Amino acid sequence: LLTDIDRWNESDEAVTLMTIHSAKGLEFPIVMIVGLEEGLFPLGPQSYEVEELEEERRLFYVAVTRAQQKVYLSYANSRRRFGGHPMPAVQSRFIHELPEELVSVKTGIKAAETAPSLSILR
Protein backbone atom coordinates (compact mmCIF):
# COMPACT_ATOMS: atom_id res chain seq x y z
CA LEU A 1 0.00 0.00 0.00
CA LEU A 2 1.61 3.25 -1.17
CA THR A 3 0.95 6.66 0.30
CA ASP A 4 1.58 10.06 -1.27
CA ILE A 5 4.76 10.40 0.75
CA ASP A 6 6.05 7.12 -0.74
CA ARG A 7 5.73 8.72 -4.19
CA TRP A 8 7.19 12.07 -3.10
CA ASN A 9 10.05 13.31 -5.25
CA GLU A 10 12.34 15.93 -3.74
CA SER A 11 13.09 17.43 -7.15
CA ASP A 12 9.40 18.19 -7.83
CA GLU A 13 8.63 21.88 -7.43
CA ALA A 14 5.34 21.43 -5.64
CA VAL A 15 3.67 21.98 -2.32
CA THR A 16 3.49 18.78 -0.28
CA LEU A 17 0.75 18.46 2.32
CA MET A 18 1.27 15.91 5.06
CA THR A 19 0.73 15.21 8.70
CA ILE A 20 3.51 15.84 11.17
CA HIS A 21 3.71 12.10 11.82
CA SER A 22 4.39 11.36 8.15
CA ALA A 23 7.03 14.12 7.99
CA LYS A 24 9.28 12.46 10.58
CA GLY A 25 12.73 11.91 9.11
CA LEU A 26 12.12 14.19 6.11
CA GLU A 27 13.36 17.73 5.51
CA PHE A 28 12.08 20.49 3.27
CA PRO A 29 13.50 23.90 2.33
CA ILE A 30 10.37 25.64 3.64
CA VAL A 31 7.78 24.32 6.09
CA MET A 32 4.41 25.89 6.87
CA ILE A 33 2.59 24.88 10.05
CA VAL A 34 -1.02 26.02 10.27
CA GLY A 35 -3.65 25.91 12.99
CA LEU A 36 -1.35 26.84 15.86
CA GLU A 37 -4.19 27.65 18.22
CA GLU A 38 -5.11 26.36 21.65
CA GLY A 39 -7.65 23.60 21.12
CA LEU A 40 -6.05 22.56 17.81
CA PHE A 41 -2.34 22.40 18.59
CA PRO A 42 -2.19 21.51 21.43
CA LEU A 43 -5.42 19.66 20.87
CA GLY A 44 -7.48 20.59 23.88
CA PRO A 45 -8.42 19.71 27.44
CA GLN A 46 -7.05 16.17 27.08
CA SER A 47 -3.68 17.76 26.24
CA TYR A 48 -3.52 19.33 29.66
CA GLU A 49 -2.39 16.00 31.06
CA VAL A 50 1.39 16.33 31.35
CA GLU A 51 2.20 13.29 29.19
CA GLU A 52 -0.16 14.25 26.36
CA LEU A 53 1.00 17.87 26.36
CA GLU A 54 4.65 16.78 26.22
CA GLU A 55 3.87 14.48 23.27
CA GLU A 56 2.25 17.37 21.39
CA ARG A 57 5.24 19.57 22.25
CA ARG A 58 7.53 16.89 20.76
CA LEU A 59 5.38 16.80 17.62
CA PHE A 60 5.66 20.58 17.33
CA TYR A 61 9.45 20.23 17.61
CA VAL A 62 9.39 17.58 14.86
CA ALA A 63 7.35 19.89 12.62
CA VAL A 64 9.60 22.91 13.17
CA THR A 65 12.81 20.96 12.65
CA ARG A 66 11.68 19.63 9.24
CA ALA A 67 12.62 23.04 7.79
CA GLN A 68 16.04 23.44 6.22
CA GLN A 69 15.75 27.20 5.68
CA LYS A 70 12.51 28.70 6.99
CA VAL A 71 9.43 27.75 8.90
CA TYR A 72 6.17 29.72 8.76
CA LEU A 73 3.74 29.41 11.64
CA SER A 74 0.16 30.58 11.35
CA TYR A 75 -2.92 30.81 13.49
CA ALA A 76 -6.38 32.27 13.09
CA ASN A 77 -7.74 35.17 15.12
CA SER A 78 -11.11 33.42 15.08
CA ARG A 79 -12.34 30.05 13.91
CA ARG A 80 -15.70 28.53 13.03
CA ARG A 81 -16.08 25.07 14.47
CA PHE A 82 -18.63 22.54 13.27
CA GLY A 83 -20.61 25.15 11.33
CA GLY A 84 -21.09 27.38 14.35
CA HIS A 85 -20.44 31.06 14.81
CA PRO A 86 -16.88 32.40 14.68
CA MET A 87 -15.19 32.03 18.05
CA PRO A 88 -12.05 33.89 19.14
CA ALA A 89 -8.92 31.76 18.81
CA VAL A 90 -5.95 31.85 21.17
CA GLN A 91 -2.42 31.49 19.82
CA SER A 92 -0.78 28.17 20.74
CA ARG A 93 1.40 28.19 23.84
CA PHE A 94 4.09 26.46 21.74
CA ILE A 95 4.67 29.67 19.76
CA HIS A 96 5.45 31.54 22.99
CA GLU A 97 7.99 28.87 23.95
CA LEU A 98 10.19 29.63 20.93
CA PRO A 99 13.32 31.74 21.49
CA GLU A 100 12.43 35.38 20.71
CA GLU A 101 15.61 35.94 18.72
CA LEU A 102 14.51 33.29 16.21
CA VAL A 103 11.00 34.63 15.64
CA SER A 104 10.04 37.37 13.21
CA VAL A 105 6.39 38.48 13.28
CA LYS A 106 4.85 39.46 9.95
CA THR A 107 1.32 40.57 9.27
CA GLY A 108 -0.69 40.35 6.09
CA ILE A 109 -1.28 43.18 3.65
CA LYS A 110 -4.50 44.12 5.43
CA ALA A 111 -4.06 43.21 9.08
CA ALA A 112 -7.81 43.45 9.71
CA GLU A 113 -8.44 40.70 7.15
CA THR A 114 -5.50 38.41 7.83
CA ALA A 115 -4.00 36.87 10.93
CA PRO A 116 -0.37 37.50 11.81
CA SER A 117 2.14 34.95 10.62
CA LEU A 118 5.41 34.08 12.28
CA SER A 119 8.67 32.94 10.75
CA ILE A 120 11.49 31.12 12.50
CA LEU A 121 14.85 32.10 11.08
CA ARG A 122 17.66 29.58 11.02
Segment roles from a protein language model:
Residues L1-L102:
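Conserved helicase C-terminal RecA-like lobe
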Residues L98-R122:
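Acidic, low-complexity intrinsically disordered tails
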